[in-house]
Amino acid sequence: MSVSILEQAGVSAATETIPEMALRAVLMPFYNNLGDRNSSFDLPEGVSQFFVAGAFLVTPDQDWHMLTASLGFPSEQNRLMIPIDGGHPGRVRATGEALYLPDTNAEAGKFKQYLKTARMGSAIYAPMIWQGKFIGQIVMAARARNSLYPKDFALMRAAAPLAAAVYVAKGGLEWLVKMYPPVDAYKVSPEGL
């Protein structure tokens, strides 16, 4: 399954002409297939499992991580903007290393909720590095704890260089300069919501 997901991501992204749509095409197979979707989860009454995915790009002024290619995020957070050193996106940028959080509750006091709809229980962050420079990160999160697995983490790490290459090849660096700052920016503080 892993090779087919990567292949699907690459083939889909190659047909896109807009950088953000190319990133979304890379992420869509992961968003649709990774993680546990059917187990009995330890979720509050009336809450069901759901996933989000996207790419947080470093803005041209280096002040923010800006959400693009969002999947599953609320529409008003289409351009969620997290301060550059905020939360786990800031940690991934600082270290340049991918981050796997099977249970965000295990990160006592460290996990910051930026998603408006819910606190996510599992999360993956994989850096997009282009020619030695950190340009952003792809992310995926699940509402339920322990529902993203090491195999999902490995696939997201493998997808991150593909995402970076596709984004740059489609003119993403220039696209970001032209569209920044976004009119629909949803800025949050480092502390989260």
Explain the meaning of each model-derived region:
Residues 78, 141-158, 166-175:
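Regulatory loop-to-helix N-cap segments in sensory/regulatory domains
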Residues 7-67, 170, 192-193:
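Helix-loop-beta substructure at the N-terminus of cytosolic sensory domains
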Residues 46-48, 114-120:
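Short loop/turn motifs at secondary-structure junctions and domain boundaries
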Residues 58-113, 174:
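Regulatory sensory and allosteric helical modules in signal-transduction proteins
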Residues 132-142:
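Sensory beta-strand/linker motifs that couple input domains to effectors
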Residues 169-193:
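Signal-transducing coiled-coil/dimerization helices and immediately adjacent hinge/linker segments
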Residues 50-52, 87, 123:
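Short coil/loop residues immediately preceding or within conserved phosphate-binding loops
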Residues 122-129:
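A short, aliphatic-rich beta-strand micro-motif
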